[in-house]
A protein has these predicted regions:
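Catalytic cores of secreted/periplasmic lytic hydrolases that degrade extracellular macromolecules
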Residues: 1-126
Length: 126
């Protein structure tokens, strides 16, 4: 079994829960998690339970959100730290829901993974 398959199998329940709650295709969420976290093996995923590379905003920090400091695009960037992988999946979904640039995606059906991936790319998802 490939590392991608192992990741998808291990975290499928989290992705399915997010699909039920928010309508985001589980396959899209898993694909983003696979890419962003190197199949859950990145330092950010291992140390901070952050599977989507979500950066800690000033609002996150002001509300008491924990963060780790890593070099990504620039040195010493702040990334959200979560108590669990499930919290990371939930924050990823809320990030998409609360960001107006992704609104068009939410007009699509949860089984329209192609439309979702195109919509996310057009909206500028990194």
């Amino acid at each position: 079994m490939s590392k991608n398959q192992q990741y998808a199998e291990q975290y499928a329940d989290f992705a399915m829960e997010q699909m039920r709650r928010y309508g985001i295709p589980a396959s899209v969420t898993l694909a983003q998690g696979i890419l962003e976290s190197s199949n859950g093996q990145s330092r950010l995923a291992q140390n901070e339970n952050n599977h989507f590379g979500i950066k800690a905003t000033p609002a996150w920090i002001a509300e008491g959100g924990r963060y780790g400091i890593y070099t990504d695009d620039k040195p010493n960037e702040k990334f959200c730290s979560y108590d669990s992988v499930g919290d990371s999946y939930e924050h990823h979904s809320r990030f998409l829901v609360e960001n107006k640039r992704y609104d068009r995606c939410f007009a699509l059906a949860p089984d329209d993974y192609k439309g979702w991936t195109e919509g996310l790319a057009k909206a500028g998802y990194a």
